[in-house]
């Protein structure tokens, strides 16, 4: 089935791409979660609109990505969360928490979908995450998780 992606789907494509996937994957996963719409001839107009919107929000060049990478790696990120006596957190740190902590620390605004946590952060201390700014550029961000 041909579909038009409305959001970036890892391993499949970016918003505005027209891709061919299995019918069940499209009907049961992508379309109900609004990650994609069915492809139609009239949908080609939607593709252009989605691509224009993506272009505005996308980091345009590798130079821009490297500039943001330098700013990100220079920021000291501290995240205060509730924790128990043994240093274990109540819950875990999510990419959305990391994105808001980066912005609060004076860093650039980062989309939470670009933050890659190796595994959920569930303990206090220093942790390293990466931020995929461009297909060829990733920034390493050190996060210090402290008790609130």
From Swiss-Prot:
Pfam families: Ribosomal_L9_C (PF03948), Ribosomal_L9_N (PF01281). GO terms for molecular function: rRNA binding; structural constituent of ribosome. GO terms for cellular component: ribonucleoprotein complex; ribosome. PROSITE patterns: RIBOSOMAL_L9. One of its GO terms (biological process) is translation. The keyword rRNA-binding applies. Keywords: Ribonucleoprotein, Ribosomal protein, RNA-binding, rRNA-binding. Gene3D superfamilies: Ribosomal protein L9, C-terminal domain, Ribosomal protein L9, N-terminal domain. Disulfide bonds: none annotated. Transmembrane segments: none annotated. PANTHER family: 50S RIBOSOMAL PROTEIN L9. Belongs to the bacterial ribosomal protein bL9 family. Binds to the 23S rRNA. This is Large ribosomal subunit protein bL9. It comes from Streptomyces avermitilis (strain ATCC 31267 / DSM 46492 / JCM 5070 / NBRC 14893 / NCIMB 12804 / NRRL 8165 / MA-4680).
């Amino acid at each position: 089935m041909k579909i038009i992606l409305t959001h970036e789907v890892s391993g499949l494509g970016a918003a505005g791409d027209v891709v061919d996937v299995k019918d069940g994957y499209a009907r049961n996963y992508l379309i109900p979660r609004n990650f994609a719409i069915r492809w139609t001839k009239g949908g080609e107009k939607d593709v252009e609109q989605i691509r224009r919107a993506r272009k505005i929000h996308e980091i345009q060049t590798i130079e821009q990505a490297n500039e943001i990478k330098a700013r990100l790696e220079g920021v000291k990120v501290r995240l205060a969360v509730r924790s128990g006596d043994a240093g274990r957190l109540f819950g875990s740190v999510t990419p959305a928490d990391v994105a808001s902590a980066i912005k609060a620390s004076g860093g650039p605004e980062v989309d939470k979908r670009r933050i890659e946590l190796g595994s959920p952060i569930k303990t206090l201390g220093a942790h390293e995450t990466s931020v995929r700014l461009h297909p060829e550029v990733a920034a390493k961000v050190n996060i210090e998780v402290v008790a609130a």
